[in-house]
Amino acid sequence: MDQMSPDNINGVILAVSSSIFIGSSFIIKKKGLKKAGASGVRAGEGGYGYLKEPWWWAGMITMIVGEVANFAAYAFAPAILVTPLGALSIIFSAVLAHFILKEKLHMFGILGCILCVVGSTTIVLHAPHEQKIESVKQIWQLAIEPGFLVYSAVIVIVVAILIFYYEPRYGKTHMIVYVGICSLMGSLTVMSVKAVAIAIKLTFSGTNQFKYFNTWIFILVVATCCILQINYLNKALDTFNTAVISPVYYVMFTTFTIIASMIMFKDWASQSGLKIATELCGFVTILSGTFLLHKTKDMGNSASGRGSISMPTRDTPVFTNSGSGRSSSSDKVAS
């Protein structure tokens, strides 16, 4: 194992801080969505009453702080290192949901959290070093290579189909629609965020990158994708259980981001097969943890007041909401 570079260490510190804030923001925002939904049209039904709810804004501010830290992390470390550390936000989200929203975290959920930590640590210790970037134009050349252009086109087409065809029909019953939109757009967001973060870093170092039109195109992509992600993430949070949204969103978002980073930045080009395999094992470990969190989400929430365990059955829909968001047992939480 090579010694971690100073830039990678800075990236890890920022990414972990980001996870704490972002994981907390899920819970704070959902509390705001619940309070707003109790007195008006819910976000899942197209309402925007949450914009008047202080709890929702507190959650947004917390998320912004986390995203700023995450943004800065991409200026120092490769996406393959920074993005998987988002698993830590799942832990904070699940634990806070247990205590604040009363969305119970079973012992297998705790095991899932531990697996996420182990997998994240494995990736941190074996992550590739960031390639040297001297200008935003260098990133632009990577972005307009045929491979990444094809990837971007496929993402845009799939997202358009999800928004205009599947969301009106299945959005309220199939979580994968909302989460899919957020995750797919998120992979493009991360690539653009990394470009903007590096541009800011280089500008503060004395080389102004904002004189290039390329930088402003990356900023436009970030703004557009973020607006879409916030809108559909709000709908997902208002309709489905937070403890389910967080891990599934993480898995999809991280998978597509790693694919995008491999295509655009070719992060693994300088690594040995053993290191790549170790990083993949770390990622699979994280996926196992998120799977446990998802599949055992209803354990300990049975009707028995003594906390008997209700095992999920084979017929339990994995990516659907069996009833309306208002009637879900996990959402019956006092404001």
UniProtKB/Swiss-Prot annotation:
**Positions of transmembrane segments:** 8-28, 56-76, 80-100, 105-125, 144-164, 180-200, 213-233, 245-265, 273-293
Q: What is this protein called?
A: Probable magnesium transporter NIPA1
Membrane topology type:
Multi-pass membrane protein
Q: Which GO terms describe its molecular function?
A: magnesium ion transmembrane transporter activity
Query: Lineage of the native species?
Result: Eukaryota, Viridiplantae, Streptophyta, Embryophyta, Tracheophyta
Q: Which SUPFAM superfamilies match?
A: Multidrug resistance efflux transporter EmrE (SSF103481)
Source organism per UniProt: Arabidopsis thaliana (Mouse-ear cress)
Q: Which residues lie on this side of the membrane: Cytoplasmic?
A: 29-55, 101-104, 165-179, 234-244, 294-335
Instruction: Tell me where the signal peptide lies.
Output: none
Subcellular localization, as worded in the UniProt entry: Cell membrane; Early endosome
Q: How does it assemble?
A: Homodimer.
